Amino acid sequence: ISLFNASEINLANSDILDMTSFMPKGNAQVQDFISNNMTFLGFNTRIAKLSDPRTRQAISMLIDRESIVTHIYFSRAEAAQYAINPQSWLNFDTRDKLRADSAGASMLLRDAGWEPNEDGIYSMQQGGNTLTLRLEIIVNSDSLQRVQTAEEIRDRLRTAGIDAYVTQCSYTEYTQRVGSGNFELFIGETELLPNNDLTPLVGSAGNYFGYSNAEVDTLLAQMGTVKLESDIKAVSIS
């Protein structure tokens, strides 16, 4: 960016924060494009509080993706329905957009066995003990946008009866905790593969979330064998 600022190079790729901090000498044109970088909320499916997919889905339903895109990324991002670039040829219209739905989230939480306690926080009885839906969101403190994203998600969850809080970590601590599975929720960012292979994210052989699903593994394997674009899309939709 400093070289671009000094007009020593003609082209630079940057995020929104850099472009608001550095202005090149002379005229410059800015062209927006959708990259393969995906920011996401990661769940630790190994822990009791997040082992039920209905709980995870409820949390997802509470997130206002459009608000994050508009107010944190200054509309220089696009809310994705799933882990595929919205501009990719593989993208398809689900019709069911992922919009914030507090009522739907509440129904899912109750279906999963959670009930609001006297303080309005969801909890349940498990093995004779009270399990409270108190969740830590860890985030790398080096990224202002991801910190703000974590804080907005925290606020949305708190409003809905989930006692969420944010812990800002150094890059070293953050990577250590995510890599060792020492987290509940985390704000992550990854670059999706050009061939749209989602194995690193959801394959049972190894992912950060402890997620395992034999049916998903079968679909991922099929993605690697089919060649026609129509067949690949059909497997992806499955």
What are these regions (language model features)?
Residues 51-155:
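Append "and occasionally in soluble cytosolic enzymes with long acidic Gly/Pro-rich linkers
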